[in-house]
């Protein structure tokens, strides 16, 4: 039976040339129809077995392209930093050209509304990734700031490469020695005469780089990465691997690990897991995520009073949990008991195919009858073969080796308490991107 297709339509470089007329579910949260106008990207849930994809960002190099099309704003004007200072927890002292910075927007209660990355590409030029629309933000403030802004969503691509061979691949593709590029810094380069930006950052915690450029150049550059990367063991990675990277990399991600309190999106995300639906633990402050060092109180910003009070009192912090293997097997056995309604536990990780997959799985963490934290993004590490999760927890329990219990199962099901052990962040403690010695990697030699 042939599948009816539409004529060629305006698509991103990552979509096929001809699109089946019926609705598609490729990456589960990314359903696409010809009239969805690029709202969702087409991207596989997986290219290979989950463990093959995940081991690549430890042993060789994983290549992820599922962020495209991405919310990218090109901004001109020194007032942009003044505007962000008024709107975020950050200050922008010591922010030279080429530097990237993690930027956090909070509500009046000190809970995170949005976070993303800002790259300074010139004295008055910036690229904002997953940040509030600068024109909208300026308008909300009464348009006091002089800036020029363009949304590059349809014109920009981002490729993410993670793993100890990532530097070698990027250098060979660009034909440029990038050993001097520091963590969270960017530089300009070319790939076959096409201008790109290289940023040393990544989600997996391992050595990682991003390649940014014009969307029209994306297919050719992608193929070149695969061709050159084959020698170094490059592995395409799908959505599941990318989500799990954040847990292994000890990086909280909005809508994966915590919810936001924002009226227009009240129906956008739904909770699954054992955490009570009215629990404040579903909303995270920077301190809940271990990002308290980014909060600067030398300026006014939304949420300042709440965060200042939080910083001065007993509060939560971020850890990992290692789940007890015997208790995990008890859940697997209970699933097959017809007298119990136990939620199935996917060994690879929690991924809920509901509400177009805008579901956040969060489990309650207890010490006896005391609710002490919220666990999310449970996954089986392909490298350590430990079941781990990322967790915000009462700081009294943020001690290596502390034993806690995670409640497994949605309300209304047969719930089980599973033992877990606290381990401090980061989960990957050796050869992290921020301190990886790139001089242990040979400098490139290029064929003439």
Where are these regions (language model features)?
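Conserved, structured C-terminal
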Residues: 2-57, 120-448
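Extended, compositionally biased flexible segments
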Residues: 59-125, 129-146
